[in-house]
Amino acid sequence: VVNLTNHAYWNLHGADSGKILDHPLKVKASKWLPIDGTHIPTGEIADVEGTPMDFRLAKAIGRDINADFPPLNIGAGYGQCWVFDDWEPGKFQENLVELRDDASGRVLIMGSDQPGAQIYTANRVTGTPLNCSGRPYGQQEGVAIEMQHFPDSPNKPNFPSTFLPAGKKYENHIVWRFLVK
């Protein structure tokens, strides 16, 4: 069973610039994975429409982060997996996630061949790790966008498989493009 990803935190404002709550985020996903009280997906694949999980049109990360919505209450913010529209095994898709800083014009656009993105707004980060200037990161000062298979896939038969047969090669693709607009 293999489900590798990258857990980099992004803050397009730059180092020592505070929270990412005003960063507009857009995700090409009309579905997401509800979680239980231990942050594990329940197996349900739910619609984003009409919920704080709807990022099909760009909106500030902080707009709905404190909404009275059980999945956000469990983790004190975002920490869920979004299911990409039109995913097919082995098919690379461009422009799946876009993160912006409108003040600087910096834009991060991500593509992948993975079926989803786990998006975590550093809700429980409290003083570690240290940033590039040696200052501890604080809560919601970065957002991790992890292109990956769905968490707990081996235990959810309706999720895409993460099984890798012995002797087979594992490969996935994630592309980060940076622009200034």
Q: What is each stretch, according to the model?
A:
Residues 1-181:
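An exposed, glycine/acidic-rich loop-and-rim segment of catalytic or binding clefts
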